[in-house]
Swiss-Prot record:
GO MF term list: ribosome binding
Organism for this UniProt entry: Psychrobacter sp. (strain PRwf-1)
Pfam families: PRC_RimM (PF24986), RimM (PF01782)
Record keywords: Chaperone, Cytoplasm, Ribosome biogenesis, rRNA processing
Source domain of life: Bacteria
Transmembrane regions listed in the UniProt entry: none
Function: An accessory protein needed during the final step in the assembly of 30S ribosomal subunit, possibly for assembly of the head region. Essential for efficient processing of 16S rRNA. May be needed both before and after RbfA during the maturation of 16S rRNA. It has affinity for free ribosomal 30S subunits but not for 70S ribosomes.
Entry's free-text remark on domains: The PRC barrel domain binds ribosomal protein uS19.
Family listed: Belongs to the RimM family.
GO BP, sorted A to Z: ribosomal small subunit biogenesis; rRNA processing
Assembly information from the UniProt record: Binds ribosomal protein uS19.
Protein name: Ribosome maturation factor RimM
Domain PRC barrel as annotated: residue spans: 99-176
Amino acid sequence: MTKPNADSLMKIGQLKKPYGIKGWLWVFSETEEREAIFSYSPWWMKTATGFKPLTVTQWRRQGTGIVAQFEQVPDRNVAETMNGVSIWIDKDSLPSTEEDEYYWSDLVGLSVINKQDECLGTVKELFETGAHPIMKVVPSQDSIDDEPRMIPWHKQTVDVVDLAAGRMVVDWERDF
């Protein structure tokens, strides 16, 4: 298997603590539907020495979560060293998005400009809250101030997303 280009990868999950004695691990999925993570392959794990393949041999629902066994993890001793390892896939293996739909990874790094043409910062991450996703916007060199912001990812807040220009326009005052 050829090594992936790190720039073409997208994080889709993370390995958590071991489950049982046979090397199974809890899997935290960042996909919209939790179990959809298993429909993508190949998986890559990010290590200190670069990206290495991670092959799922079997998986199942366990309580409110999911657990999986991997070819590279033969027993619990190895599994204990895997807690926190991130799971990545090649972006090219993802289906195309519809108009006005975006993968969160495409939004990270965009400049956030309000309707008053003030730069509020850069999108650092998005996370789900239950009601709607939230963008964590951190100060950038061009920001109007040094304040981090939490801005809802919602059609009433986000007016324009221009991936080619690397920016989005939001209806969000600087002092919210």
